[in-house]
């Protein structure tokens, strides 16, 4: 089911646009579909046919996604394992201070070497209402004021569904445009389409290295944009929407944590409308990568910040409960057979 399908379903029951808007807003807030106001109860506002049909619509919406399990962490975050209608699993993460990270694909075709999700390949796309349903489930647990599309999957490979979800959340969902964050490895289609949208989200770009060859090794199936081209495209979007680009950099000890790389960041980002997010690597079973020491991370932040690049450390939420993206799902689906979608269909 997509957004237009939901509106058509309600229209078939006799709902006018005003009724549809109120019903959809109630769902997006995690409330009952017939939730109205103290001054105007449902029986005074919704047509009889709509009221009679809402229980079935509610059941259909509940069937889009359900909470399989919740895993609270010591840092105030909570990782949600969400089961979709076909029993596929995705992860979303409730973050401190009202944030939520949602998944846009089951699996991923980019194959980043430091990401658990990429190990499974792409299994299927997540529909727009399946993304929104992750927000609904989260809002039933705590307030959600910011949604980042940084969970499982590459949003640019599911662009229509992601943009539809962003539009719905940025209008009826009541989330400010700057508080909707589209994360991508840098697909050119993103830079073409985002400026044309009614809801223009903030943008996070996966950089990870200023050396083109190393970046290709770390993100083997990312579009062939050089780091310089990626930053130029990001800067153009930032100036158009008037909020900075977030550049993502997973810190891997001995690989991309050298001062030479930090100087490369200064060369690319100094004077740009940008924030550099350094993300200490979250280890996975059976890999050879490690995060730098805490002292080294502090040194790198100070090095960049003191030379004119706003730099923050973004630790993976819930590190004590399989905090890296895709790790919780991998543990839950261990031993089950899964069919991958070839990368060319991504």
Swiss-Prot record:
Cofactor binding notes: Binds 1 [4Fe-4S] cluster. The cluster is coordinated with 3 cysteines and an exchangeable S-adenosyl-L-methionine.
Domain Radical SAM core, first and last residues per copy: 94-320
Localization: Cytoplasm
Record keywords, A-Z: 4Fe-4S, Cytoplasm, Disulfide bond, Iron, Iron-sulfur, Metal-binding, Methyltransferase, S-adenosyl-L-methionine, Transferase
Gene Ontology terms describing biological process: rRNA base methylation; tRNA methylation
Disulfide bond sites: 101-325
Record-listed [4Fe-4S] cluster binding positions: 108, 112, 115
Catalytic residues (UniProt): 91, 325
Family indicated by similarity: Belongs to the radical SAM superfamily. RlmN family.
Name of this chain's protein: Probable RNA methyltransferase PA14_40730
């Amino acid at each position: 089911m997509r957004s237009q399908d939901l509106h058509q379903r309600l229209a078939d029951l006799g709902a006018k646009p005003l009724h549809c808007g109120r019903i959809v807003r109630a769902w997006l807030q995690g409330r009952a579909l017939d939730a109205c106001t103290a001054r105007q109860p449902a029986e005074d506002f919704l047509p009889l046919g709509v009221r009679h049909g809402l229980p079935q619509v509610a059941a259909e919406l509940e069937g889009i996604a359900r909470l399989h399990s919740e895993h609270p962490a010591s840092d105030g975050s909570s990782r949600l394992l969400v089961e979709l209608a076909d029993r596929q699993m995705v992860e979303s993460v409730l973050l401190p201070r009202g944030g939520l990270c949602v998944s846009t694909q089951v699996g991923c075709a980019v194959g980043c070497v430091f990401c658990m999700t990429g190990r499974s390949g792409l299994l299927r796309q997540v529909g727009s209402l399946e993304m929104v349903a992750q927000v609904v489930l989260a809002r039933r647990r705590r307030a959600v004021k910011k949604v980042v599309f940084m969970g499982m999957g590459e949003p640019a490979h599911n662009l229509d569904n992601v943009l539809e979800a962003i539009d719905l959340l940025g209008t009826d969902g009541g989330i400010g445009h700057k508080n909707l964050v589209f994360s991508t490895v840098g697909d050119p289609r993103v830079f073409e389409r985002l400026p044309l949208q009614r809801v223009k989200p903030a943008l996070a770009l996966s950089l990870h290295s200023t050396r083109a060859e190393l970046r290709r090794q770390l993100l083997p199936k990312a579009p062939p944009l050089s780091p310089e081209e990626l930053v130029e495209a990001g800067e153009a979007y930032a100036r158009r929407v008037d909020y900075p680009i977030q550049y993502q950099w997973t810190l891997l000890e001995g690989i991309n944590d050298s001062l030479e790389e930090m100087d490369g960041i200064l060369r690319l980002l100094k004077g740009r409308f940008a924030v550099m997010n350094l993300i200490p690597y979250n280890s996975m079973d059976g890999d050879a990568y490690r995060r730098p020491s805490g002292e080294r991370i502090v040194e790198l932040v100070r090095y960049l910040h003191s030379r004119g690049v706003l730099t923050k450390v973004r630790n993976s939420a819930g590190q004590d409960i399989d905090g890296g993206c895709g790790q919780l799902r991998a543990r839950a689906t261990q031993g089950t057979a899964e069919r991958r979608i070839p990368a060319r269909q991504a």
